[in-house]
């Protein structure tokens, strides 16, 4: 008599400690459903390898207490079920794919061996869903060491964060932290500058001015060559930034020569702007040992001031200005802190300098990082991410959907940054569209547009996509004046709603709509 296993969103048992009546889709035995057809099968259980024969596979869907479908499936996920699930209208939130996980997707979700997974996925291949289900799987299997608070997803914007926010709770896990890398950078730069231009401002400015030099300058500052220029500058800065002088305060006495030896030899590996702090602590410890007591806070402040005066400046904003001048770029305005604002092209170079000069980078509480839209991150940004997060990563995107005009393939340079510790996976199968469908749509596009009605009742979501924010705002106002029920997504939006939406191409990244009209 074959043993029957039921698989669902989560475990269900009559009482705690009893065998489940329904097994969680992430349980080891559940992998049989996704990985095998009828016939021989095996799975790795805590007790070892379990082998057997799959006699039959059935699929059920129950909604509101009623059976939607029930039939035997000879394949992993029956095509009729897949078509039914994919054929439903786009919801205002991403759907979980537990019922339709494919074998190649399941291999990614259950991968626990590779430290860094880089997934190149075509539009509609399900890469974002797969990444989120992978996080749910890892949280389930490593509960002792991995909590939701240890996971961070870097997403394109707040609307996208809202779009995916329900997936993990729906799969039985607490939500994880989500933010854009830009927002992360702005928070890290507080104390250096109070304000930064964002990526959207930079895009709008570039499109408005149509100045190729601005685009070229922005791109240059994000490339490997500029990282090399910054490293060369930092090597020379050791000599240019320091003004050594003898220290004498109470029993603390160090000659200029002694301080130079400590700086260049004993503490040579300490970050430049933290090095004198290390030397100060060394001298204070030495003196306190001889004195037999600790210095008071007031005395320590006096000593600190004497050591700090050996820096020409500790202001990273000014130091970056020197770098720009040395590299032949326009320098930063020489203004007081409150009036400083970085252009977007300078945000990540300054962040890189901060980490290299202070050493305050690693966020050890993050044990798994998810990077979505990987194609929109620069070489410099990945170098910084490698400095900050010494953890497992799931990196995903599609090089065909990049905002970068040069269409650089990030998978070419990622292994060099992460020391080859990367498993590359390609997901070519799209569940949204095909070349044949796209060609047919192009052929009948005029006829479709002449008959189409914006936001027809049978569609849950529709979008009008513009190039610039000004165009989107104007169009939104026109439609509102006509009495249309319409939503507007701008950079400050945080919720994705049903109905007709007007937005820009760069804010629509990652979202799905039933109807899309480009203006």
Regions found by a protein language model. Name each.
Residues 144-145, 149, 158-174, 179-186, ...:
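Conserved helicase motor core of SF1/SF2 NTP-dependent helicases
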């Amino acid at each position: 008599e074959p043993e029957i296993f039921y698989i669902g969103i989560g475990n269900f048992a009559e009482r705690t400690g009893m065998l489940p009546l329904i097994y969680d889709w992430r349980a080891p035995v559940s992998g049989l459903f996704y990985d095998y057809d009828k016939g021989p099968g095996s799975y790795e259980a805590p007790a070892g390898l379990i082998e057997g024969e799959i006699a039959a596979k059935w699929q059920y869907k129950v909604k509101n207490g009623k059976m939607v479908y029930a039939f035997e499936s000879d394949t992993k996920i029956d095509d009729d079920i897949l078509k039914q699930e994919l054929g439903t209208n786009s919801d205002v939130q991403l759907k979980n794919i537990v019922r339709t996980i494919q074998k190649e997707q399941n291999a990614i979700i259950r991968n626990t061996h590779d430290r860094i997974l880089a997934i190149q996925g075509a539009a509609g291949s399900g890469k974002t869903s797969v990444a989120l289900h992978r996080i749910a799987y890892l949280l389930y299997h490593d509960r002792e060491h991995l909590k939701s608070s240890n996971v961070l997803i870097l997403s394109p914007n707040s609307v996208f964060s809202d779009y995916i926010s329900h997936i993990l709770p729906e799969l039985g896990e607490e939500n994880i932290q989500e933010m854009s890398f830009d927002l992360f950078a702005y928070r890290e730069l507080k104390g250096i500058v109070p304000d930064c231009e964002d990526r959207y401002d930079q895009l709008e400015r570039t499109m408005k001015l149509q100045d190729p030099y601005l685009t070229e300058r922005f791109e240059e500052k994000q490339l490997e060559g500029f990282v090399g220029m910054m490293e060369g500058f930092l090597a020379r800065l050791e000599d240019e930034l320091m003004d050594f002088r003898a220290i004498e305060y109470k029993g603390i006495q160090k000659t200029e020569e002694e301080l130079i030896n400590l700086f260049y030899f004993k503490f040579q590996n300490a970050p430049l702007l933290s090095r004198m702090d290390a030397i100060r602590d060394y001298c204070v410890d030495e003196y306190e040992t001889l004195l037999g007591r600790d210095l008071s806070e007031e005395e320590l402040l006096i000593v600190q001031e004497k050591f700090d005066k050996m820096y020409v400046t500790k202001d990273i904003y000014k130091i970056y200005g020197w770098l720009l001048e040395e590299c032949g770029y326009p320098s930063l305005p020489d203004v007081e802190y409150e009036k400083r604002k970085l252009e977007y092209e300078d945000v990540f170079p300054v962040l890189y300098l901060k980490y290299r000069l202070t050493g305050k980078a690693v966020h050890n509480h993050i044990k798994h990082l998810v990077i979505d839209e990987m194609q929109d991150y620069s070489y410099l940004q990945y170098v910084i991410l490698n400095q900050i997060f010494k953890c497992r990563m799931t990196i995903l995107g599609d090089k065909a959907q990049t905002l970068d005009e040069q269409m650089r393939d990030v998978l070419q340079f990622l292994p060099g940054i992460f020391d080859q510790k990367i498993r590359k996976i390609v997901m070519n199968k799209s569940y949204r569209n095909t070349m044949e469908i796209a060609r047919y749509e192009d052929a009948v596009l005029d006829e479709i547009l002449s008959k189409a009605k914006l936001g027809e009742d049978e569609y849950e979501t529709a979008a009008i996509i513009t190039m610039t924010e000004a165009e989107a705002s104007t169009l939104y106002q026109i439609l509102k004046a006509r009495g249309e029920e319409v939503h507007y997504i701008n950079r400050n939006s945080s919720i994705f709603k049903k109905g007709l939406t007007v937005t820009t191409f760069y804010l629509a990244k990652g979202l799905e709509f039933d109807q899309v009209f480009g203006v």
